[in-house]
């Protein structure tokens, strides 16, 4: 078998992308296309009393202005986000009192109320983008402002203005999980108890490529063609068809190169449906590309979780039980409950905690909807348990590393069922710690601390273990075609946005089929070709796609033996396959794939294979962060960062390392500078541009020391877990622990994210002043 899996092969797609040959949505244009601009609400909550579009329609070039009333007349349906997780292993989230969950319909344009700042209320179609923007400026909307709430905790406490009249209390999810009786008994008998509350703030993805769509309607075929970058074209096709009130085969979605996702592109946006609908009404293709300011107002956002956690321990420091109350802010409507659904069952982290309960709540507020953002829900709960362990170690006067070691699940205990019921299939958590400490030169930290002190700096070292649960949409399909021209086509329904799928998927197919990686072409993104696929999210792509490619390749090899037996005039039982060739056992007679394809009926050497996997996998790792702080200014320098990740079997270690680098920076961004900030008095955004929303740059971080500790998962034939999210999961806790460690001499015990220099300086001053 040709060795391709596990090799650090350079990415096949890079030359195309680096030479400007990428196919991003805004790169496409259509003859006679027109442009769409969006009129957005200036209020976080208001009733729409009326709309005057006369001034806009009279402007040169304006072809039409469409409103929520027009949507209702044309019977456009709400976007079917289906926010509740659906796999066999997901939590059964319910509403208060075990009621059905109210999700808040997401109309393309509302006709009654706006429920968050920046919500679309009308669209203007014009000959040029400038004319469309001019028209949007003069659409006059009459609003009656309504009381609003944007605070997560306040929404959960009740008494805030209802976002939806159908749900006066604003709490749409309220479910509890775990062993309540066992937890209470452990709390009653414990020697020590620690409790803390944390807020993991709201952030947004800021993908390099702004949201864009080009839609056209063909009246002769009664069919829509929609170019739209996404996390999965198949899902977009299905949901847009429902919005437009047509059959799925009347919609074609094309999603080729995508300039960043991070979860923000995995759900349908109203602009996609609006452009398609407007194309039908105007009779011409319609194009829309968001600008960065619009993105800050209307891209789905992430995180925004309040959690209160309590941990009890015995006299020796062994964990006995944990209790958590997680409150997720879903914004103005439920686009996804993934953050609360995925995070809550992992509240115990990598640790042996015999009993636990978690209350999982989700609330509506007058904010942009939140969505599954890179490592959805897991960085939040990892932050909570890793910060709580540091607090417990301080209160018990124990070494925090020793406290972790004492309570980590041992490899001999695998597979391990955690107290909420998740079944960890594999992992060597102690080994992760040992490898990370060696790579980080843990024993040299005191020397570095003294050196920093001599320069007037405070050195801090932070530690975090993490474990994730990766599953995602359970169905994936591939089609493999051996082409007589001398290449292989692999059609797959995932959607890359920088992950290197064209290379890593090709490595799997190449090794199984015994062919060079360069022979394999990955086909994605056109729903006229890709019929089934779950897209890219939740760390699913390599595992789901790799598994179904292997299954299909195995069956294709068996078919190849049948064809080879005919060509070589031998019995099928005498045909063996090795290194891309079919050989008659004990002879030198053989034939390769492409010769077989040339000599067999067209299409015979092809296969369509589907697979369904409901079993999650559990990537895990250890991160160590080192910082230096200037106590006079609060300035922070990130000096060292080490990550050890168990991604299962790494198909391409170089690509995995690249994913880890990006994920670490994304997590550090939240910990250091990123925050969606709203004015509590007016509800207006204070972080609506890249001048105001902090983003880390390459110069803000050191060279990372990244290592792999590959423990294959037994749940799939390749042993894959996931490699795209671990850096984001561990880094916020590791960084915050480093900051608190640096400030321990002042008695600082916690600092909220983002730990900006101003926030650090204030913590020092407050500690000095008692």
Which role fits each region the language model picked out?
Residues 7, 13-16, 82, 87-102, ...:
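Glycine-rich loop/linker segments at domain edges
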Residues 59, 68-69, 87-91, 99-100, ...:
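C-terminal catalytic domains of large/alpha subunits in multi-subunit enzymes
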Residues 76-80, 135-138, 237-239, 262-268, ...:
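Short acidic, glycine/serine/threonine-rich loops at helix termini
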Residues 125-129, 270-277, 307-318:
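Active-site-proximal alpha-helical scaffold in enzymes
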Residues 231-233, 241-245, 267-278, 304, ...:
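A glycine- and small-aliphatic-rich helix-loop capping segment at beta-alpha/alpha-beta transitions
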Residues 261-283, 287-289, 501-509:
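Thiamine diphosphate
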């Amino acid at each position: 078998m040709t060795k391709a899996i596990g090799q650090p092969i350079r990415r096949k797609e890079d030359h195309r992308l680096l030479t400007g040959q990428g196919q991003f949505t805004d790169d496409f244009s259509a003859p006679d296309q027109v442009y769409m601009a969006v009129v957005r609400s200036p209020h976080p909550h208001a009733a729409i009393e009326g709309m005057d579009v006369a001034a806009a329609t009279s402007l040169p070039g304006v072809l039409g202005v469409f409103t929520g009333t027009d949507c209702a007349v044309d019977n456009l349906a709400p976007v079917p986000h289906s926010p509740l997780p659906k796999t066999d292993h997901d939590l059964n989230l319910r509403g208060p009192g075990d009621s059905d969950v109210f999700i808040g319909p997401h109309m393309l344009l509302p006709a009654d109320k706006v429920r968050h700042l920046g919500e679309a209320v009308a669209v203007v179609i014009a000959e040029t983008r400038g004319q469309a923007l001019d028209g949007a400026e003069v659409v006059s909307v009459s609003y009656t402002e309504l009381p609003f709430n944007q605070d997560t905790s306040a929404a959960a406490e009740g008494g805030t203005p209802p976002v939806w009249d159908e749900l006066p209390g604003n709490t749409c999810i309220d479910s509890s999980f775990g062993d309540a009786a066992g937890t209470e008994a452990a709390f009653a008998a414990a020697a020590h108890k620690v409790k803390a509350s944390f807020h993991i703030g709201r952030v947004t993805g800021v993908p390099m490529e702004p949201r864009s769509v080009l839609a056209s309607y063909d009246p002769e075929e009664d069919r829509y063609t929609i170019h739209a970058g996404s996390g999965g074209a198949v899902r977009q096709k299905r949901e847009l068809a429902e919005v437009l009130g047509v059959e799925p085969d009347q919609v074609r979605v094309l999603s080729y190169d995508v300039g960043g996702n991070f979860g923000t592109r995995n759900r349908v946006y109203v602009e996609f449906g609006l452009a398609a609908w407007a194309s039908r009404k105007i009779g011409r293709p319609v194009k829309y590309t968001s600008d960065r300011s619009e993105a800050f107002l209307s891209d789905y956002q992430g995180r925004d979780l309040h959690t209160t956690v309590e941990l009890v321990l015995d006299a020796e420091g062994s964990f006995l039980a944990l209790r958590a109350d997680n409150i997720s802010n879903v914004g103005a409507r439920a686009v996804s409950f993934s953050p609360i659904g995925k995070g809550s069952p992992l509240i115990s982290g990598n640790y042996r905690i015999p009993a636990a309960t978690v209350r999982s709540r989700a609330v509506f507020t007058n904010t942009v909807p939140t969505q599954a953002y890179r490592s959805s829900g897991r960085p939040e709960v990892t932050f909570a348990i890793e910060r709580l362990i540091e607090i417990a170690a301080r209160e018990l006067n124990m070494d925090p590393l020793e406290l972790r070691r004492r309570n980590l699940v041992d490899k001999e205990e695998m597979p391990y069922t955690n107290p909420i019921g998740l079944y960890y299939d594999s992992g060597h958590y102690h080994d992760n710690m040992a490898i990370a400490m060696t790579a980080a030169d843990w024993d040299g930290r005191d020397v570095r601390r003294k050196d920093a002190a001599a320069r007037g700096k405070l050195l801090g070292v932070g530690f975090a273990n993490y474990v994730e649960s990766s599953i995602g949409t359970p169905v994936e399909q591939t089609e493999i075609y051996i082409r007589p021209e001398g290449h292989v086509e692999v059609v797959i329904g995932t959607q890359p946005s920088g992950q290197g799928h064209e290379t890593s998927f090709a490595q799997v197919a190449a090794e199984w089929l015994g062919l060079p990686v360069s022979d394999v072409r990955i086909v994605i993104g056109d729903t006229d070709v890709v019929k089934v696929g779950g897209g890219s999210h939740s760390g699913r792509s390599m595992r789901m796609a790799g598994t179904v490619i292997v299954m299909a390749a195995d069956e294709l090899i068996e078919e190849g033996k049948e064809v080879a037996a005919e060509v070589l005039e031998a019995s099928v039982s005498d045909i063996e396959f090795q290194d891309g060739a079919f050989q008659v056992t004990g002879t030198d007679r053989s034939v390769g794939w492409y010769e077989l394809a040339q000599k067999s009926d067209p299409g015979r050497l092809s296969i369509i294979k589907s697979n369904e996997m409901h079993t999650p996998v559990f990537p895990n790792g250890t991160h160590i962060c080192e910082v230096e702080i200037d106590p006079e200014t609060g300035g922070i320098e990130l000096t060292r960062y080490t990550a050890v990740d168990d991604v299962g079997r790494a198909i391409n270690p170089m690509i995995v390392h690249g994913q880890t680098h990006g994920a670490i920076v994304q997590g550090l961004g939240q910990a250091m500078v990123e925050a969606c900030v709203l004015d509590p008095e007016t509800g207006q955004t204070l972080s609506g541009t890249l001048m105001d929303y902090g983003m880390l740059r390459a110069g803000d971080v050191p060279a990372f020391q990244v290592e792999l500790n590959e423990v294959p998962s037994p749940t799939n034939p390749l042993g894959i877990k996931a490699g795209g999210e671990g850096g984001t999961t561990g880094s916020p806790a590791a960084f915050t622990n480093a900051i608190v460690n640096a400030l321990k001499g002042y008695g600082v015990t916690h600092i909220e994210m983002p730990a900006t220099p101003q926030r650090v300086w204030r913590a020092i001053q407050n500690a000095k002043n008692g």
